[in-house]
Amino acid sequence: FASYVIKNDVKATTMKSGIEYMVWLSEWYRANSSGKGVGFFQIGGGIAGDFPICVVPMMYQDLEWHDVPFWSYFCQISDSTTSYGSYSGAVPNEKITWGKLDIHTPKYIVESDATIVAPLIFAWILGW
C-alpha cells in the first residue's frame, strides 16, 4: 500500500488507520450494543484477530464509560491449540482477565480449520 501512495496511485487516506477503526468501532458499538447486545465471532486468533474485541475494555477502562455492556457472546474458530502456548491458542476464559469478556459471557471455541468451518457456519446462518 505504501508503494502505491509513494507513486501517487492512491492517497494515504484511502485506508483508515488502526486508531480510526477503533474510534469508528467504539461509536458503532455504543449505537448497537443495547437490548440483546452484540456478539463477537472471531475467525483465527492472535493480535490481529483480537484487535476489535478490545473496544469494550477501552471504553470501560480507559474512557471510564461504565454503562458499556460486555459482548453478549464470544465464538472463535481457531486451529491453534492451547498446549502450544501461543497467543492464537489462548482460550476464551483468558479474555476475562483483560476485561474483554465477562465471566457470564457465553464462550465457544471451534477447534478446526476456519477455511472449512466458517463457510459451513455462514451457510447455516443464512439458511443455505
Sequence positions of predicted segments:
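C-terminal functional extensions of proteins
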Residues: 47, 54, 61-128
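Active-site rim loops that border cofactor/substrate pockets in soluble metabolic enzymes
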Residues: 1-43, 48
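Extended aliphatic helical segments
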Residues: 5, 10, 23, 38, ...
